[in-house]
């Protein structure tokens, strides 16, 4: 009974996590270019 809900949560969280990591890396990359470290 809990497995479909759990798998749904995991399947929903994985793309959000990947997008969050990508955005964080992109912002860090932009900030690094801005200050030219």
Curated annotation (Swiss-Prot):
**InterPro entries, sorted:** Cyt_6/f_cplx_su5 (IPR003683), Cyt_6/f_cplx_su5_sf (IPR036099)
Where is it localised?
Plastid, Cyanelle thylakoid membrane
GO CC entries? cyanelle thylakoid membrane; cytochrome b6f complex
Any Pfam family hit: PetG
Q: Which HAMAP family match?
A: Cytb6_f_PetG
Tell me its family: Belongs to the PetG family.
Q: What is the recorded name of this protein?
A: Cytochrome b6-f complex subunit 5
Q: What is the lineage of its organism?
A: Eukaryota, Glaucocystophyceae, Cyanophoraceae, Cyanophora
Which gene name belongs to this protein? petG
């Amino acid at each position: 009974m809990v497995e479909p809900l759990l798998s749904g949560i995991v399947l929903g969280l994985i793309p959000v996590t990947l997008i969050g990591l990508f955005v964080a890396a992109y912002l860090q990359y932009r900030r690094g270019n801005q200050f030219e470290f």
